[in-house]
Amino acid sequence: MVALAQDLPDLAGKEIVVVTENAYPPLQFLDGSGAAIGWEYDAMAEIAKRLNMVVKYENTSWDAMIPAVSSGQYDIGMTGITIRDDRKEQVDFSDAYMRSEMVMLVRGDETRFTDAKSFGANADLLMAAQPGTTPFYVGVYEVLDGNEANPRIKMFETFGAGVEALRTGDVDLVLTDGTAGNGYVAASEGKLKIVGEKLGAEDFGFIFPKGSDLVAPVNAAIADLAAD
């Protein structure tokens, strides 16, 4: 792949500010020592190497990320962001770097429901979500009744807070992409599991301010990585 890499744009050591949330393992999160790690960090480091750019990381909340990138406060945003047409009105997306499907993450001893239909049928069951996210919309329209104000959806500022509420019994379901869901299950020592069929598929992309001249180089690097 050396020949391909030589054909990539050379950004001549340009500093790029990338904003992340550090709250969506295994894509990006803080390890036990407080270091930011994850698949997206590894991918961005490789993209930076191939494009000869220097990455500086900043941190913000999910609800602030798209507006902040849209306004030009940051050059790139990454936190497992689903490529959606409504978001394209505010930001530009890279090509997809990962495809995932929603899974139902529940406590390891859960027996009251086994799939989306049985969860939806039991009015006592609650799900966690972050507002405006793909899991929120999948929960509303594929699991529940299409009412975005359904009181069975409990809102949390971060994905991790929703998972913690699941662990403690404050909610009964978290929807997440399969990559993150499997990561949580593997680390849970049997306290979490995945049930039911996979739900709507989603493609993840990096986000940029509208008209950014970084989209084409990053897309070229993503294609180069995929060819490896």
Label the predicted regions.
Residues 30, 44-52, 116, 134-155, ...:
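Ligand-binding cleft/hinge of the Venus flytrap
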Residues 63-67, 79-90, 138-141, 167-200:
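A ligand-binding cleft/hinge motif common to bilobed small-molecule-binding domains
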Residues 22, 99-106, 178, 186-223:
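Periplasmic-binding protein-like
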Residues 5-80, 89:
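Extracytoplasmic small-molecule ligand-binding "clamshell" domains
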Residues 20-24, 58-63, 72-84, 100, ...:
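Beta->alpha turn/N-cap motifs
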Residues 108-126:
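Flexible hinge/capping segments at coil-to-helix
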Residues 41, 56-67, 112-114, 153-165, ...:
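Short helix-initiation/N-cap motifs at beta->coil->alpha
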Residues 17, 53-54, 70-79, 124-126, ...:
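Alpha-to-beta junction loops
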